[in-house]
């Protein structure tokens, strides 16, 4: 039963894997985070209760915390400024009024540790996205410094593809690529330092950037949530093993072991796995913001 968000009086202009966008005017839109969950680029039938609210709170926390590094998509307005009260009441904890930006056509991924597709690439070639790494690194090795490893943006339902920095420059231009790389690494570095003080290692994360009407690079979409990042607990971190994470890893692991072929439709996820996932998202919010 895929979650249906309340019908709003605004015009829906986009429905993504997790978020729906509504038009306010030519400068602003409303972004609403659903409880939908995607794994292996397939949207699961079962929503994760309150996930959209938790993700929105985590994102908003980081947008504010990192505002000194660069501008973000906030307009400063609340949902009550753009919706009738009865509609705003229903989505106030999962919606944000944001600027309409021209999205940059790459996924800006920063890695501080080696795991996932980065580890796979490294094992095969000794590099990630064309960047040479030292020999002898293993699962969960901390990198000497954070690296920018962009991927191309594919259509919903397709897998994003890791690209080299040179390919990134080709796609978006050398000047913009340099700005994106610098800002992405600065955001990751500041966030990772803060998170460590709260007992969380940010292994890697994906940022989304856009350009405003004046061509100013602006942080958008979601920031440093368990959906866009891998969070590990300092307590369970150990080089050489894949640490448990504060995100949909429970569900991904269950799906990996279920014999599913990773094509839609996905199998039904057991209630206890869904509850564990909610608890992990909530724990990430509590640790980061308290």
Predicted regions and their residues:
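Surface-exposed helix-capping loop/turn segments at secondary-structure junctions
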Residues: 67-73, 190-202, 215, 289-290
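Coil-to-beta-strand transition motifs
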Residues: 28, 103-105, 199-202, 214-217, ...
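Anionic ligand-binding catalytic core segments
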Residues: 124-128, 132-176, 219, 223-288
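Conserved metal-phosphate-binding beta-hairpin within the catalytic cores
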Residues: 110, 202-223
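Active-site loop/lid in soluble adenylation, ligation, and acyl-transfer enzymes
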Residues: 1-152, 262-289
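A long amphipathic alpha-helix within ATP-dependent nucleotide-binding catalytic cores
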Residues: 172-203
